[in-house]
Amino acid sequence: MLKPLGDRVILDQPQEEETTVGGIVLASNAQEKPSTANVVAVSDGRVLDNGDKVAPTVKVGDKVLFDKYAGTEVKYDGQTYLVLHEKDLVAVID
């Protein structure tokens, strides 16, 4: 499994097939990506300039809302993940 560094988190976005009203299945690159995902890995936290460590505010298993254009898609072991900084997370969904 990937282990994020610094203040990064790794998200797993569920891939859903989208069908138009006319029954046409849209290719994944033609669909707008959702801005919600599940946290699958969290770093140990970021280190401040004075050396103090700030623990992450999310944990593995949390469902989160994130900025639409945040992060980098990474393919690993046949799966696509999104790696982003914790500051790009907007909310945890209960």
Curated annotation (Swiss-Prot):
Q: Which domain of life is it from?
A: Bacteria
Disulfide bonds, paired cysteine numbers:
none
The family database entries (Pfam families) matched by this protein are listed as: Cpn10
* Keyword Transcription (UniProt): no
Which keywords does the record carry?
Chaperone, Cytoplasm
A molecular function GO annotation: protein folding chaperone
Q: Which GO terms describe its biological process?
A: chaperone cofactor-dependent protein refolding
Q: Which GO terms describe its cellular component?
A: cytoplasm
Q: What is its main location?
A: cytoplasm
Q: Which PANTHER family match?
A: 10 KDA HEAT SHOCK PROTEIN (PTHR10772), CO-CHAPERONIN GROES (PTHR10772:SF58)
Family to which this protein belongs? Belongs to the GroES chaperonin family.
Q: What does this protein do?
A: Together with the chaperonin GroEL, plays an essential role in assisting protein folding. The GroEL-GroES system forms a nano-cage that allows encapsulation of the non-native substrate proteins and provides a physical environment optimized to promote and accelerate protein folding. GroES binds to the apical surface of the GroEL ring, thereby capping the opening of the GroEL channel.
Share what the entry says about its subunit structure, partners included.
Heptamer of 7 subunits arranged in a ring. Interacts with the chaperonin GroEL.
Q: What is this protein called?
A: Co-chaperonin GroES
Protein species of origin = Levilactobacillus brevis (strain ATCC 367 / BCRC 12310 / CIP 105137 / JCM 1170 / LMG 11437 / NCIMB 947 / NCTC 947) (Lactobacillus brevis)
**Gene (name only):** groES
